[in-house]
């Protein structure tokens, strides 16, 4: 997920600013953007027919209704095991637009149908970028820059492996490369070296590509020659040449290089499509709708069993219970959103596809994103009846949840922006747990809530089973309360 509460909210804002060239995340050594905006790719929706030891025992039994249903489709752990298997068998991830993502979509649809829900897919288009190997920049003589420390790939870079002389563009000015005239006489087939500044990275890369550059290296340095490399983005696919950023010292070394320099980027950058899975259970009266959702994709770096397999599994367990029990008054609709990790593309596309009348029908939206963190701090966020229903249900099942800033870092934001009341449950990401929170929830102070956030170790061993069960039971009660 993109964290909906305090510490990572700044990182989310930085990531958004990075896409428009206004800022970045990670401190002075990892900023992105050049001071003016660049448009990102949109998303569309068209309806189609249908490693670190956890702080708490990950395998401990769930309580309440989840424990009573252990081993059945009403138990979240049943679905978590299946999601973990998909991640392990598909290059270690379930990312949108990949085989693991497709397998996740199909699993969710199958289990919802088994529970008696009407299911449909919705196609979503989004920009896809996957860096297969770290970047390589090799100077004459064989010295290589350190990937991550001296050189980084800009997201949506083109792929390639080139060796050519380096040509400094614009004499090292910060605005170098921003104007077409800066590229007059550029020797085709050489590697362009430009300094960061003034216009977006994508603007410099597009002009370099148009001038015939084999690759472009963007240098980030302050007045003393130190800084960087930036963690930046080109905003969307379209640049075909390798595009990397280096720190000031490395940039100076490239400018002095006598002979060919090698630049390699091994990545995939393209528009792709994936599917939301939307399921509905008709109510007994009226035309109001209560919604709940979770994102179905992981980051490419890991299988995402907590982020957000835990939310998906909790909702699938709820779908089974609700599908086999008495129908509520209001219609229930569950959404499993694709490409959340890339920028909320799935939920944004879904909300945009609703007419004004359809939006007014949606009474509430409940979001579940990361509800099984191994060093959990249980939080609710949202407003009105929706958060109140979740809070009451959680209060009845253990320590009262903490209140979190609503933020805009997960799929609830798409609904909130459309004027729909939202609420959600969250158990923490990479932020460290404070002493008071640790005492309240039995967590370890000073340790991350989820030490495997966005990492390859976000496996089944990284999930607190009892916490997922508690959340599933509480959300079931909350949704029943909202739906009547």
List PLM regions with ranges.
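Bacterial signal peptide processing site
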Residues: 26-29
């Amino acid at each position: 997920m993109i964290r909906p509460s305090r510490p990572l909210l700044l990182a989310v804002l930085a990531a958004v600013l990075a896409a428009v060239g206004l800022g970045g995340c990670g401190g002075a050594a990892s900023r992105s953007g050049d001071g003016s905006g660049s448009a990102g790719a949109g998303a569309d929706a068209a309806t189609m027919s249908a490693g670190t030891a956890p702080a708490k025992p990950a395998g401990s039994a769930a309580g309440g209704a989840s424990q009573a249903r252990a081993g059945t489709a009403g138990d979240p752990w049943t679905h978590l095991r299946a999601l973990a298997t998909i991640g392990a068998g598909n290059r270690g991830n379930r990312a949108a637009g990949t085989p693991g993502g497709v397998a996740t979509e199909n699993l969710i649809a199958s289990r919802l149908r088994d529970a008696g829900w009407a299911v449909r897919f919705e196609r979503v288009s989004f920009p896809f970028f996957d860096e297969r190997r770290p970047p390589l920049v090799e100077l004459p003589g064989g010295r290589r820059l350190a990937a991550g420390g001296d050189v980084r790939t800009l997201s949506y870079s083109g792929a390639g492996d080139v060796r050519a002389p380096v040509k400094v563009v614009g004499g090292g000015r910060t605005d170098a490369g921003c104007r077409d005239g800066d590229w007059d006489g550029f020797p085709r087939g050489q590697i362009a070296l430009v300094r960061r500044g003034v216009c977006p990275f994508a603007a410099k890369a597009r002009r370099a590509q148009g001038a015939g550059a084999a690759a472009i290296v963007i240098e980030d340095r302050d007045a003393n020659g130190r800084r960087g490399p930036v963690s930046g983005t080109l905003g969307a696919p379209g640049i075909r040449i390798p595009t990397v950023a280096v720190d000031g010292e490395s940039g100076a070394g490239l400018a002095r290089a006598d002979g060919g320099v090698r630049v390699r980027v091994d990545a995939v950058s393209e528009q792709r499509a994936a599917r939301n899975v939307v399921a509905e259970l008709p109510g007994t009266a009226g035309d109001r709708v209560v919604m709940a959702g979770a994102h179905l994709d992981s980051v490419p770096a890991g299988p995402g069993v907590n982020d957000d397999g835990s939310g998906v599994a909790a909702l699938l367990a709820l779908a089974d219970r609700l599908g086999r029990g008495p129908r509520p008054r209001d219609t229930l609709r569950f959404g499993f959103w694709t490409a959340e990790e890339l920028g909320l593309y799935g939920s944004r596309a879904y909300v945009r596809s609703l007419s004004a009348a359809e939006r007014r029908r949606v009474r509430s939206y409940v979001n579940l994103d990361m509800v099984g963190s191994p060093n959990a701090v249980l939080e609710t966020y949202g407003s009105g009846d929706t958060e109140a229903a979740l809070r009451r249900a959680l209060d009845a099942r253990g320590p009262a949840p903490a209140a979190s800033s609503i933020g805009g870092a997960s799929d609830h934001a798409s609904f909130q922006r459309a004027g729909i009341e939202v609420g959600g449950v969250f158990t923490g990401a990479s932020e460290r747990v404070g002493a008071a929170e640790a005492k309240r929830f039995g967590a370890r102070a000073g340790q991350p809530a989820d030490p495997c956030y966005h990492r390859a170790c976000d496996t089944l061993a990284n999930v607190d089973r009892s916490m997922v069960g508690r959340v599933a039971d509480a959300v079931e009660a909350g949704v029943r309360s909202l739906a009547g």
